[in-house]
């Protein structure tokens, strides 16, 4: 009988300690916990910048400073893959550094000159404002999802990345096909996608 009383006391004490430990978990003081990412080092999604009909991809023609850019069919290396490094946001939207995955160099107006007809080339990161770009949706698909984008320079948002006759240039945005870009994921982006409702 004494043993049974000791067991009861031990169980009661254990239950009280367990309640004292769990009780703070169930109190609500009006504070809502914020959700955060599990990992902050999740790899950035690489993108392909495709022309309007998605037949060619913006590709770096080299890996050194001053390398030209052109539209080419997709190859087997990372010269056509781009990473969008967020720099900040303001009244015009969010702006990025567009980093080539093969070289680590940025989309840059030649000599940092942001003016009409300036060539756009690759150059190392200098944290110049002319190396910052807004990627702005301009047309949607039939479901209302953003489809075509213009890529305009931070220093002059009227100047867009434009396919010129011999490479990429800055030109006044007019909405022509050579200024419209598709943002296509380079590889697996997620688990969802369009499906046929057949």
Question: At which residue positions do the language-model features occur?
Answer:
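N-terminal secretory signal peptides that target proteins for export/translocation
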Residues: 1-7
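Lectin-like carbohydrate-binding module/patch detector with strong preference for beta-trefoil
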Residues: 30-198
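Sec-dependent N-terminal signal peptides of Gram-positive bacterial secreted proteins and lipoproteins
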Residues: 9-28
